[in-house]
Structure formats: C-alpha cells, structure tokens
Amino acid sequence: NLDKAKDCRSETNEVIIVEGYMDVVSLYSSGIKNVIANSGTALTERQIDIIWKFFSNPIICLDGDISGQKAALRIAEKLFPLINEENKIYFSTLPNGNDPDDFIKQNGKKIFLSHLKEKQVVQTYIWNFHINKIDKNNPFEISKFEKEIKKMCYSIKDETLKKYVLEDFL
C-alpha cells in the first residue's frame, strides 16, 4: 500500500505502519489513507530506509497486546541508531490490547487519530517501556538500566543527536 500512502502525504509527513493487511483495509476504508502494512512484526533497516524516502515521520502502530508491544520494542531498539533530525520514528500503543482493525471499528476514525496524537518519539518509547519494568528502589536494576540506555544512545550514528539524546536521558 506504499504507492497509495505516498500519494496521501500531508504536511506532517507521517505514515502509519501496522502489522497486517486487515489493519490497512480497516484504516483505509475509514478514510485514513496514509497507512501501510509491515506484514508482520519485524521492520528492517532496508524497509525503514524506503519508507523514509517518502515519509520522515513514520508511526509504528502494532497490536496493543503483549506480543505487539514486545515487537514494537524490538523495532525501536533496532532502528534507534538510525534516527536523525530529518528521519524520526514514533510509536503509538493502542489501549486494552487492541489492534488497529478492532480499535477503529469500535471507536471510529476521530478517536483513532486522537490517540495517534499521543505518539511517542522512539527514545521516549524505549525509556518508558523499560522504566516501567524496573524496581526504582533497587540500585542494581537502576544501574543496569542506565548502562543499557547509555549503550543504546552511543549506537546513534548522528553524533550531534547522540549528544543531546544522552543529555535528555541522563
């Protein structure tokens, strides 16, 4: 659906990336045209490079269940080193374990788009996912978490951005 989605680019330069074909069909038939399917839970560097040629602000919106959230985290951590000031990645997690198909059928376009406005940039998504899993009173867990975050930040290829993301995290 990339060919149709790129014809619907808006001033926000966003595209919604969902897991499956039915998600695309439901969103598209609801009037959301800037949507593409990843056909699964993996997203490669090659795929994101192609997407970035047309959209600088992709929004990953996988299923809101546990497996969808874990898949989104894997994507976030894999693509995190590639971000720069022109090409970003955002994440939107649907509530109550919903997938985009079910969510839009139950809530409609307006509420879906309203929910998308709460998207998180990749570094915030990673931070929030991990910070909610650790015992904040356990110095060993905090230390391990800080080391993992630093390691991820050092992987950012854009040196200037790396500096500011590190400052933001720590």
Locate the predicted segments by residue:
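C-terminal or mid-to-C-terminal helical accessory/interaction module adjacent to the motor/catalytic core
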Residues: 86-169
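Short, surface-exposed helix-loop/turn micro-motifs enriched in polar/charged residues
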Residues: 16-19, 35, 50, 67, ...
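Short, flexible active-site loop motifs that bind/organize anionic cofactors or intermediates
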Residues: 17, 38, 62, 90, ...
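Alpha-helical scaffold segments in soluble metabolic enzymes
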Residues: 4-7, 26, 50, 74, ...
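Phosphate-handling DNA/RNA-contact segment within nucleic-acid enzymes
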Residues: 1-54, 58, 71-72
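Conserved catalytic cores of soluble enzyme domains
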Residues: 10, 41-96, 102-109
